[in-house]
Regions:
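Bacterial N-terminal signal peptides that target proteins for export
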Residues: 1-9
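Bacterial N-terminal signal peptides
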Residues: 8-21
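Terminal, regulation- and interaction-focused segments at domain boundaries
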Residues: 26-65, 163
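Small-molecule pocket liners
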Residues: 37, 86, 123-124
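Extracytoplasmic/secreted envelope proteins and their assembly/folding machinery
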Residues: 48-51, 55, 72, 151-155
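Compact, glycine-rich, soluble single-domain proteins
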Residues: 55, 59-112, 116
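Beta-strand/loop substructures that line and gate deep hydrophobic ligand-binding cavities in soluble
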Residues: 114-139
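C-terminal partner/receptor-binding element of secreted or periplasmic proteins
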Residues: 131-163
Length: 163
């Protein structure tokens, strides 16, 4: 009987751990943040124009643009179809590395990335990870100011694709 109870309790704990928390809006984040930390912005433009606008705004802000990865092209080379999907990678090393001084594992989330993709209905989106969520993910809770500032910057960048 105790073994059965232990099994049920263990199963309940595992299910509880696997169940994602509800969507969250961080008090100081400009947009609703999904439970996984993703901020999804609906673009008013097609893929090429969305990418061009984002890259132009990144450059205008003096942020280093590292590269873009055409994920659909990579998938097609292996005979896999995923649809238009481009990952933009950019950042400000002086700021990003400051985040990593608080927890070096936070480097998994830097440089900054925006995923631009077109869904099955033809709608283009730009997605990124909320910086306050990243801070919480890595146990950085002492000072939210730089993360809030980073949210403002990326929010400004993605606003360039919204009418």
């Amino acid at each position: 009987m105790f073994a059965r109870i232990a099994t049920l309790v263990s199963a309940g704990l595992v299910i509880g751990m696997l169940t994602p928390p509800p969507a969250t809006t961080f008090a100081d984040s400009p947009k609703a943040v999904a439970a996984n930390g993703i901020v999804k912005v609906k673009s008013a433009y097609g893929m090429d124009e969305t990418i061009a606008r984002l890259k132009a705004d990144i450059a205008k802000k003096g942020i280093t643009f590292f590269t873009q990865i055409d994920q659909d092209k990579l998938a097609a080379a292996t005979n896999i179809k995923i649809g238009p999907s481009v990952l933009l990678i950019f950042g400000n090393p002086a700021l990003g590395t400051q985040f990593m001084t608080r927890n070096q594992e936070a480097g998994i989330d830097w440089p900054v990335r925006i995923l631009v993709y077109r869904d099955a209905t033809g709608q283009v989106f730009a997605e990124y990870t909320d910086f306050v969520w990243i801070a919480r993910r890595h146990g950085i809770v002492s000072d939210d100011a730089p993360f809030k500032m980073a949210n403002e910057v990326i929010g400004s960048i993605t606003s360039s694709v919204v009418k």
